[in-house]
Structures are given as C-alpha cells and as structure tokens.
C-alpha cells in the first residue's frame, strides 16, 4: 500500500515526537515518515506528520504559527518549567489576585517578546542540546530569541488551593515560542514563581486538533484496509505558499525541471499546478541567475 500525504496526528502524552515517528514507521511499513516540529512528551495535541512523498514538504511546515491551551500554576517554579520537574522556589499566595490585573498582565505579552530557552530544551549551544547540559547539572548561557505572541487570554477562573493558584489560558504564537517559559514569565510579572502545569497544542498551521486522529483510530483504519483515508493531500500543508496554475506547454517544461523567467510568475517562491489542478512542483528564485526561477521540489506524481 503506497501511502502519501499528511497525517494530522493527535500526539498522546508520554510519547516523544520521535517515538511517534518510529511507531508510524512500524504501523505503515515505510521509512518515509517525518514530523514537522517537536512536541514535549507531556504535551498532547496536533502533530502533523508527513508520510511517503509528503516528506518533501516537511521543511515548509516548520514555520507554522501554533496555538495552545495551557494551565499556569503560580506559587512555585520547577527545574523544567513544567510539572515534570523538581521544585526550585516557592512563595505562598497570601491573598487572591484581582482578575482584571491578571488579564492586564497577560495583555502585556501580546506582540514581540524576548525569551530565553529553558535549560530542559532541544536548543543547541556549542554543539550540545541544552537538556544534555541540564541532565549533567550544568547551567550554560542561552541565546535570547525574539518570538511573537499573537493572542493570549485567560479562559478559566483563578482557582486557589494550598497557597498556590492556577488558571487556564489560550495562546497563539509564532514558531519557536516556549509556552513553558511564557508561564514562568507570567508568574514573574505577577511577582511569584510559576510553571506550566498543563499544555495541549490545539493548532499547527492549517491543522487543528478537531481533525486529528489518535493511534487507536489509525490502527482501526489500517485493520480495515482504509489507512490512506486518514491522509490529507500534500497541498494541504503548503496552502500559505502562493499558487500558480500553468497551461500544458509550461507544464511540460516544469515536468522536466526547466529554469523559467521569473516575470511569468511574480513570486520569489510559489507552488505550480496544472490545468487539472494537480500539484507539480515548488519553484523558487534562482540563486545565481537573476530574473529566473528554478524547481525547489518536484512533486508531480510521475516524479515520485
């Protein structure tokens, strides 16, 4: 069974993104499986996975904006910035926050913000991932990064118990945003240590949690011989790239990987479809021939 397409997977808690890829390779009996952005093991939610020839477009999916539903616990911080870590600092909440003040604090994070990646993260510093240093008990200086918070809103009451409080929030953000770190920074802005106590990724680019499938659902469909029915077309993943439709004459040139004049297309990068609406290729500006475009990915069926 030749399976090609995008599988919108609902990643279960307790599995790494790599675990999911390994399991899918076994289930689908193919090595051509690739995920498009790491989700922490404790996080449940949207993980778009490229199957078969769809792995060719994985690189275009890593820049997707993301959306999450999370929970911040205010009153103590942890080594990992989430609930899996050891407690680092505690500070008892003596009196309830004014909800309007909390909402005002959240509003201050909307827009471009600076973040320092957590020590327990996959960011590389001097050739090693930060979590490798962290596990060895070494703290290293981490490069600050700029990310964008498109929206951030509290979506539950603030619940108090035993000197801490927690509330749920929705956040929409650019790629590379650490929501754990955001939770810690929200606590700092309120004057308390804090950590992220729960997280669900609800959206990744055009893929939302409502349309994702669990491993159980996938296994059931495979048993019925209908596994490919869960896959979305490759073009679903690259809808944000400008689209150009070409006639039969230009289609023939594109199928042969021709370098073409950019003035025909007016885009530095674009997807190419034929008159029947079939995806042929992704083209980009030629790096050395000014005024021309060249194929970046050949995606026509007979090229696969």
Swiss-Prot record:
Q: Does the keyword Magnesium apply?
A: no
CDD domains recorded for this chain? Answer: PseudoU_synth_EcTruB
Disulphide-bridged cysteine pairs: none
Please write the reaction equations for the catalytic activity of this protein: uridine(55) in tRNA = pseudouridine(55) in tRNA
Active site positions: 40 (nucleophile)
Which GO MF terms does the UniProt record name?
RNA binding; tRNA pseudouridine(55) synthase activity
GO BP field: mRNA pseudouridine synthesis; tRNA pseudouridine synthesis
- Any idea what this protein is called? tRNA pseudouridine synthase B
Q: Which organism is it from?
A: Halalkalibacterium halodurans (strain ATCC BAA-125 / DSM 18197 / FERM 7344 / JCM 9153 / C-125)
């Amino acid at each position: 069974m030749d399976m090609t397409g995008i599988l919108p997977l609902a990643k279960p808690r307790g599995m790494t993104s790599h675990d999911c890829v390994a399991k899918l390779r076994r289930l689908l009996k193919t090595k051509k499986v690739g995920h498009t952005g790491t989700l922490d093991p404790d996080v449940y939610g949207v993980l778009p996975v490229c199957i078969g020839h769809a792995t060719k477009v994985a690189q275009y999916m890593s820049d997707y904006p993301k959306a999450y539903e999370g929970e911040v616990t205010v009153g103590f911080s942890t080594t990992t910035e989430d609930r899996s870590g050891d407690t680092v600092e505690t500070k008892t909440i003596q009196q309830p926050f004014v909800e309007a003040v909390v909402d005002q604090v959240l509003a201050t994070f909307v827009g471009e913000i600076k973040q320092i990646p957590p020590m327990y993260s996959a960011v590389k510093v001097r050739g090693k991932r930060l979590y490798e240093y962290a596990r060895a008990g070494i703290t290293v200086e981490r490069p600050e990064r700029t990310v964008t918070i498109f929206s951030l809103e509290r979506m539950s009451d603030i619940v108090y118990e035993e000197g801490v409080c927690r509330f749920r929030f929705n956040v929409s953000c650019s790629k590379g945003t650490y929501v754990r770190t955001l939770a810690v920074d929200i606590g700092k802005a309120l004057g308390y240590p804090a950590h992220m106590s729960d997280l669900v990724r609800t959206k990744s680019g055009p893929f939302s949690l409502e349309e994702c499938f669990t491993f159980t659902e996938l296994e059931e469909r495979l048993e019925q011989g209908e596994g490919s029915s869960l896959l979305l077309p490759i073009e679903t993943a690259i809808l944000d790239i400008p689209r150009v439709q070409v006639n039969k004459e230009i289609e023939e040139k594109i199928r042969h990987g021709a370098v073409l004049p950019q003035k025909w297309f007016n885009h530095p990068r674009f997807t190419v479809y034929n008159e029947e609406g079939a995806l042929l290729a992704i083209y980009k500006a030629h790096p050395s021939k000014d005024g021309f475009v060249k194929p970046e990915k050949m995606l026509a069926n007979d090229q696969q």
